[in-house]
């Protein structure tokens, strides 16, 4: 079954699932949250809620590089760092060096500001707007760093490798 966002009558059900997902995260039930996120993606494969970004981060953060790659592969044209930089890190974790290098360079081409925020040990937090996040600005790069730098740090050699590849 599909519940496409474009159909206004489907929106209450999709919103309810996303709210349940938020509650699962709040309660610390990440397994339930991941299952709900996957359900939202199955029902609405165009992913108007951006579940793909959350799922890619959470799968990689929990050590499931293959699941992160599955999500990234389903949205090959999405330039979001949550997909592209996480794809590179997932490939690096799996020891797929050539794919990791290609993915990292592609991620950097799509979101060139991310490396400037992700790779240094310390960076100044940019001004964040109450109105939203820019597609490829310092704010988006900062938010990616804030969400994922620890995951990069926990992957032995990943930050050093990325610095070398992008240096």
Q: In which residue ranges do the predicted regions lie?
A:
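Catalytic phosphate/metal-binding cores of nucleic-acid and nucleotide-processing enzymes, i.e., regions
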Residues: 20-29, 33-38, 42, 58, ...
């Amino acid at each position: 079954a599909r519940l496409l966002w474009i159909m206004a009558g489907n929106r209450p059900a999709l919103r309810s699932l996303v709210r349940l997902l938020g509650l699962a995260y709040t309660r610390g039930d990440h397994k339930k949250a991941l299952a709900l996120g996957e359900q939202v993606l199955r029902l609405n494969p165009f992913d108007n809620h951006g579940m793909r970004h959350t799922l890619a981060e959470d799968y990689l953060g929990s050590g499931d590089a293959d699941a992160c790659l599955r999500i990234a592969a389903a949205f090959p044209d999405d330039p979001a760092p949550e997909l592209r930089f996480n794809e590179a890190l997932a490939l690096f974790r799996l020891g797929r060096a050539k794919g990791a290098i290609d993915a990292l360079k592609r991620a950097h081409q799509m979101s060139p500001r991310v490396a400037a925020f992700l790779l240094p040990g310390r960076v100044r937090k940019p001004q964040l707007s109450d109105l939203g996040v820019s597609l490829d600005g310092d704010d988006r790069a900062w938010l990616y760093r804030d969400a994922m730098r620890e995951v990069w740090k926990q992957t032995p050699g990943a930050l050093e490798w990325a610095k070398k590849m992008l240096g």
